[in-house]
């Protein structure tokens, strides 16, 4: 890639970073003025946490309380292909209202920055583009209680994208259907979650026929609170790629393993992150799935 193109990419990614800092700074500054969340019981400093963002790439089952509103800034990185250089960073800006104690929604706008060089089947590209938009519906079907600390939530997330890999124009429509279950220990120190997902996708590049694909995935995570605001954990994801909206022709699979992190800054602000690496499960598949995945998320309630 030429020096001019690299400079342009750094400038565009830098502009995104500056915008994020400006957006986050007032929220983080407000952390000094807010009181930390209070414990549920006088003898237990481990107060209740919203589980939705505790588990890295997995989702927790909480949707919040009626009337809650929040903004999320979610950065997802994908790195590495079988050959060449592949780096992709997606920035999502999310508005999340809770309509009832059982129903929540998310409205997202997506920006994509990519640096792709010498990857077979893809043109060389470096740049940043507006990618698309999404809506997520979250509905709790089984609520957590003191007697049964398990919660189950069903989600559906339709998404439209106008940009494909390597900056190619596309008309891409997908929907991710997810079953989410999580459990919290009685002392609120150990958290676990399981996600099952089905994601059909239909995409058309200019001058090419419609391509129908789908992904089935199963994920699990465990997290432990070392202090009331600080949590570390581990995540395992198993993904299978197929041709067809209804899984038909098997195209590849990947197992990802890695650590997760969550920090409750104060009652209204939390920060979470995860880093996953494709682990040996037979042959490593870098054709359908990247080598590494990373996520950083900031949520601000208001």
Language model regions located:
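Cleavable N-terminal export/targeting peptides
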Residues: 1-47
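Transmembrane beta-barrel domains of Gram-negative outer membranes and organellar outer membranes
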Residues: 31-302
């Amino acid at each position: 890639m030429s020096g001019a193109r690299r400079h342009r990419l750094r400038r565009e990614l830098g502009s995104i970073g500056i915008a994020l800092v400006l957006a986050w700074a007032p929220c983080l500054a407000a952390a000094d003025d807010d009181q930390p969340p209070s414990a549920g019981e006088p003898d237990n400093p481990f107060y209740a946490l919203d589980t939705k963002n505790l588990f890295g790439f997995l989702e927790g089952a909480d949707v919040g309380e009626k009337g809650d509103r929040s903004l999320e800034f979610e950065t997802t990185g994908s790195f590495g292909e079988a050959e060449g250089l592949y780096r992709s960073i997606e920035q999502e800006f999310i508005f999340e209202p809770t309509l009832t104690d059982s129903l929540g929604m998310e409205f997202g706008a997506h920006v994509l920055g990519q640096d792709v060089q010498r990857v077979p089947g893809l043109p060389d590209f470096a740049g940043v583009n507006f990618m698309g938009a999404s809506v997520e519906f979250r509905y709790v079907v089984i609520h957590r209680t003191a007697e049964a600390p398990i919660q189950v939530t069903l989600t559906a997330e339709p998404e439209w994208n106008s940009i494909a890999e390597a900056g190619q124009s596309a008309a891409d429509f997908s929907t991710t259907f997810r079953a989410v279950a999580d459990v919290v220990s009685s002392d609120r120190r150990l958290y676990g979650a399981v996600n099952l997902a089905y994601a059909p996708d239909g995409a058309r590049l200019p001058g090419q026929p419609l391509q129908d694909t789908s992904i089935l995935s199963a994920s699990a995570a465990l997290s432990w609170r070392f202090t009331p605001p600080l949590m570390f954990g581990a995540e395992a994801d198993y993904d299978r790629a197929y041709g067809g909206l209804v899984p038909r022709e098997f195209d590849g699979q990947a197992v990802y393993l890695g650590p997760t992190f969550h920090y409750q800054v104060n009652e209204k602000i939390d920060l979470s992150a995860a880093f996953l690496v494709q682990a040996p499960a037979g042959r490593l598949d870098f054709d359908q799935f990247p080598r590494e995945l990373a996520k950083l998320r900031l949520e601000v309630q208001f």
